[in-house]
Design a protein with these regions (language model features):
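Extracytoplasmic/secretory soluble proteins
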Residues: 1-314
Length: 314
């Protein structure tokens, strides 16, 4: 599944085995093994592969896990606020943690393990790389859910998710992920509530909305598996993005889905520590204009440093 907030990394395990390379256990090994893997793939396929992340704005939780003071909180999608487990609040970009993350990314970029145009490449290029399995390691992406698409390109592909600093706790920063709500300012909020009530009232309603008509768009297989009718490109002919509305107890997975993917959704994680700020929601409305300006400045001034294009010292 989507394990970026937990710091997961996805590996082409078949290539690590083919080239007799180990799974990395720390940040330095991640770069060293990535560099070796990049050269081996280039020698074999004549292609240059890179590290890819899920989004430009997300924080490198996979790297944070390797730091001595882990766990700590940095907002996953906005990167403005840092909170340690004592409740101390700082501006993330002014912390030592950001400097170390920036230095790590700079090393990755200088060694050619990032796409040289990381700041400007279209998102669909990254999506294509991930869904075809053309990556050194997927950092919070390259998800197990892409496996049915990847094996169309590489029939012998094997995917495995792992974590640096194995044994350190996972960090729960949100009680709910990808939740749905109805804006109070909408003209007919009751209609939205009625739809959500219908959607989650039964497994049948849930499956109809997410997967289409049984027997026409998909065939149920057992309690939590299905086969979907797909296009030539491998996409389901009628399916709503599951991450937006799927309710885990009702979830279905393709018969070609990896068992590890199903387990990642249905099996609770062990060794989890809750962030001190879980449940607190910062109301940005009174400062919405200022907040928007901060986010715009973050992208203009901090992204080049964050992604290693410009060194922290410069």
């Amino acid at each position: 599944g989507y394990g970026g907030p937990n710091g997961s990394i996805t590996a082409r395990a078949d290539l690590l085995e083919k080239y007799d390379l180990p799974f990395p256990t720390n940040a330095e090994e991640l770069l060293d093994i990535g560099e070796e893997l990049q050269q081996r793939v280039k020698d074999d396929l004549g292609e240059t592969w890179y590290f890819w992340d899920h989004e430009m704005q997300v924080t490198p939780v996979y790297f944070f896990r390797t730091l001595d003071n882990w766990p700590f909180y940095v907002d996953y999608a906005e990167e403005i606020i840092y909170i340690d487990q004592e409740g101390n609040v700082e501006a993330y970009f002014e912390t030592e943690e950001f400097r170390m993350a920036a230095d790590f990314q700079r090393d990755m970029y200088v060694r050619g393990l990032r796409h040289p145009d990381i700041l400007s490449i279209p998102r669909d290029l990254k999506t294509q790389a991930n869904q075809s399995g053309r990556y050194l390691f997927g950092l919070g992406t390259g998800a197990l859910s892409d496996y049915p698409l990847i094996v169309q390109q590489f029939p012998d592909a094997e995917l495995e998710q792992f974590y640096l600093a194995e044994g350190k706790p996972f960090y729960e920063t949100l009680p709910v992920w990808n939740s749905n709500s109805v804006p109070s300012t909408t003209d007919q909020p009751q209609a939205g509530i009625e739809f959500l009530n219908w959607l989650y009232a039964s497994n049948e309603n849930h499956d109809l909305f997410l997967y289409g008509v049984p027997g026409e768009h998909y065939e149920p297989v057992g309690d939590d598996r299905m086969t979907q009718v797909r296009t030539e490109s491998g996409q389901a002919v009628d399916a709503h993005p599951f991450w937006q509305t799927q309710y885990v107890p009702f979830a279905n997975f393709g018969t070609d889905a990896l068992d590890a993917l199903v387990d990642s959704y249905l099996t609770p994680m062990d060794n989890v520590e809750n962030a001190i700020n879980v449940g607190f929601v910062f109301d940005k409305e009174p400062v919405s204009a200022e907040w928007a300006n901060v986010l715009a400045e973050r992208e203009a001034s901090m992204y080049p440093i964050k992604w290693g294009v410009v060194s922290y010292e410069d």
